[in-house]
C-alpha cells in the first residue's frame, strides 16, 4: 500500500498488455477474434463467446468490438432459447456437446448484458428474454444448466436446477434491463433502464440505497415516461438515465411538476435522457416527454419442445434522416412480423407489407418466399421512411 513506483509499474504493464491483446487475439485474415492458442502456439479456429469479456474490458478497438457484436447477434450464434457457445458454422460445433455449441443460460445472460453495455438494447432484450421459456422445462420455475444447440431440449448432461442460471438471469435484468447501480457511500442511485417499448407499466420494489428503501414505478407511452418514487428514508441522489426512442425530439423533464434540466446522449442504436435530482419527499415523480422518435417491437420467441429455432434475429437497428434501418436474419419460408411505435406519419416501407394498427402503431411483415424449400436463415435489410409529425416542424 502506498508504493507509488509499484503503482506506476502496474499501470505501464497494464497498458502494454492491453495494447498487445488485440494483436494476439485477432485473426486479421478472417476478421474474427481468436478464442485462444494451443500449446504449440497455433490459434484455435472455432468462434465462441470468449470475445464478449474482452469487449467488456475494452481490449478490442471499436471496429473490432462492433464486428464481434454483429457476428454474435446473428442466427449462427442465436437460437430461440439462447446463445450458442460456439457458432454453428464452426468445425468444432456440436449441438449436443456440453461446451461445444450447446446453449448456456449463464453465457446467454452475459451476452445480453454485453449488448446493453455496448448500447444495443433491442438486441440485448431479444437475447435476454430467450431465457424465459427455460422456466417451463421440467419443474416450473426452475432453470436448467444447459440446453442443446439445435433443438429446444435440455442437453443430456444438464443439471435440471442450476443456481447460476437463475442468478445470471436475474442479475442481468437488474444491471442491464433496469440499469440499477447503487453507491451507498454517497447515497446515490443510478437508474439506466432499457424498458421494452411494449411495456406500459413496470414496478421495482425494495431498492436499498444506504438507509433508504425505494419503490419504483414506470409508466410508459409512445411520447413519454414517468417514474414514480416512494422513499422511506433520508434524501437520495438520483441519476435517472432512461432509454428513449431513437430520433426523439423536444425532450423535456419535470420533477414533481417543476421543469428540470435534461440532456440527451445519442448512440447509433441507443438514445438516453439524463436527469439528476435529489429525492427529498416520501413520494416524487419524474416525468419525461418527447416528440417523434421510433421504437421497435419484436415478437417473443415461442420455441416448441424438440423444435428448431425459427424466429427472426435482430442484427442492427438505427434511425437516421427520418429513416429506420433494420438488419434481420430470418427464415424466408415463414412470415416475419415486427411492430413499430412512433408519432411519425406516412411510413413508406417499400416492398414490405405495412398495416396501421393504431395512430402510433404499425405492423410490418416481411413476406415469405414461396419458392423456398428449406428452413435456413437469410440476412435481410429493411428501410422504412417517415414524415415528421406536424408538431415537430
Where are these regions (language model features)?
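Extended, well-ordered alpha-helical scaffold segments
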Residues: 1-22, 61-75, 119-134, 185, ...
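Alpha-helix capping and helix-loop boundary segments enriched in small/acidic/polar residues
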Residues: 5-12, 41-45, 95-102, 157-164
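Extended glycan-interaction surfaces of carbohydrate-active proteins
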Residues: 18-104, 136-151, 217
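Non-catalytic C-terminal accessory modules of carbohydrate-active enzymes
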Residues: 75, 110-355
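Aromatic sugar-binding surface patches on proteins
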Residues: 267-273, 360-367, 376-382
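Surface-exposed interaction regions enriched in Ser/Thr/Asp/Glu
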Residues: 281-300, 370-393
